[in-house]
């Protein structure tokens, strides 16, 4: 996937990421997962977004990069959230990767838990070291076009954003592959 792909707005990229592959290399081993659920955060006009009203902090600085960079942060003091920055530099939008479906064979894994944003980062060993990483040309964490992009997309309200304004709470900016068993539960 090239830079141009990520220069679109977050709601467009969030839909287009579905079915594509996220690849994590750990100790010469590749873990391949298929993105099955995303949420769009539309920047300074979206009260659910960390960069709402142009808020810029050490944590949100990653969102001000050009599209294609990662934005990783911690919630509840223990769960890492993996986002992909979209749009132009200084237009702080991002897509939260909410759930993924394992594709590569996993040696020694009996039960894979990737149906939630905190679970998938734990599974893929994504932590703050992956904040502000350019995902284009990176060797440890990168995206690749999926082979099967024939599916229905469900649009719904985003999850756990009760702090946002009502208009933003009601936006249908959560996207997932219909019928996929790895989609997170609300």
Curated annotation (Swiss-Prot):
GO terms for molecular function: alkylbase DNA N-glycosylase activity; DNA binding. Disulfide bonds: none annotated. The keyword DNA repair applies. One of its GO terms (biological process) is base-excision repair. It is an enzyme of class 3 (hydrolase). Keywords: DNA damage, DNA repair, Hydrolase. Belongs to the DNA glycosylase MPG family. This is Putative 3-methyladenine DNA glycosylase.
């Amino acid at each position: 996937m090239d830079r141009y792909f990520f220069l679109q707005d977050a709601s467009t990229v969030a839909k287009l990421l579905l079915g594509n592959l996220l690849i994590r290399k750990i100790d010469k081993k590749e873990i391949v997962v298929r993105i099955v659920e995303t949420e769009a955060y539309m920047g300074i006009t979206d009260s659910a977004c960390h960069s709402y009203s142009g808020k810029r902090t050490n944590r949100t600085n990653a969102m001000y990069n050009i599209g294609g960079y990662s934005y990783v942060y911690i919630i509840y003091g223990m769960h890492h959230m993996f986002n992909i920055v979209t749009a132009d530099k200084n237009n702080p939008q991002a897509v939260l990767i909410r759930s993924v479906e394992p594709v590569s064979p996993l040696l020694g894994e009996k039960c894979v838990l990737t149906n939630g944003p905190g679970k998938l980062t734990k599974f893929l060993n994504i932590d703050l070291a992956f904040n502000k990483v350019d995902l284009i040309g990176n060797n440890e964490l990168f995206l690749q076009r999926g082979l099967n992009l024939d599916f229905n997309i469900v649009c719904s309200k985003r999850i756990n954003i009760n702090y946002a304004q009502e208009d933003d709470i009601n936006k249908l900016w959560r996207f997932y592959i219909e019928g996929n068993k790895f989609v997170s539960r609300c």
